[in-house]
Amino acid sequence: MKITQEEVTHVANLSKLRFSEKETAAFATTLSKIVDMVELLGEVDTTGVAPTTTMADRKTVLRPDVAEEGTDRDRLFKNVPKKDNYYIKVPAILDDGGDA
């Protein structure tokens, strides 16, 4: 399946990313190869092969769901450089958020 440069540009715009025309072409080629490889997996005969759900031979160990007292809020905020009424203030990294 061929991924077009327009599709790469569309997804990049949704992700608020900008690429040069050369980078966009390279991504389109690379993504097309990846999709082709994944499509090949669909052609593999898996008759008689048991489904694999995990590669780890571990059982999930869950702790009891017990309410515990948390850490003191003032102690947590002791080293926070900028705060406002128990909210941590951080620099903005997005302009207006856009309409992704």
From Swiss-Prot:
InterPro entries this protein is in? Asp/Glu-ADT_sf_sub_c, GatC
From what superkingdom does this record's organism come? Bacteria
Which keywords does this chain's UniProt record carry?
Answer: ATP-binding, Ligase, Nucleotide-binding, Protein biosynthesis
Report a single Gene Ontology molecular function.
Answer: glutaminyl-tRNA synthase (glutamine-hydrolyzing) activity
GO BP terms: namely: glutaminyl-tRNAGln biosynthesis via transamidation; regulation of translational fidelity; translation
- The kind of enzyme this is, by top-level EC class, is ligase
Q: Which Pfam families match?
A: GatC
Reaction(s) the record says it catalyses: L-glutamyl-tRNA(Gln) + L-glutamine + ATP + H2O = L-glutaminyl-tRNA(Gln) + L-glutamate + ADP + phosphate + H(+); L-aspartyl-tRNA(Asn) + L-glutamine + ATP + H2O = L-asparaginyl-tRNA(Asn) + L-glutamate + ADP + phosphate + 2 H(+)
For this protein, the Enzyme Commission number is: 6.3.5.-
Give the quaternary structure: Heterotrimer of A, B and C subunits.
The record's NCBIfam families line, in alphabetical order, gives:
gatC (TIGR00135)
The protein's job, in short, is: Allows the formation of correctly charged Asn-tRNA(Asn) or Gln-tRNA(Gln) through the transamidation of misacylated Asp-tRNA(Asn) or Glu-tRNA(Gln) in organisms which lack either or both of asparaginyl-tRNA or glutaminyl-tRNA synthetases. The reaction takes place in the presence of glutamine and ATP through an activated phospho-Asp-tRNA(Asn) or phospho-Glu-tRNA(Gln).
* Family as reported in the entry's similarity comment: Belongs to the GatC family.
Q: What is this protein called?
A: Aspartyl/glutamyl-tRNA(Asn/Gln) amidotransferase subunit C
Which species is listed as the source? Streptococcus pneumoniae serotype 19F (strain G54)
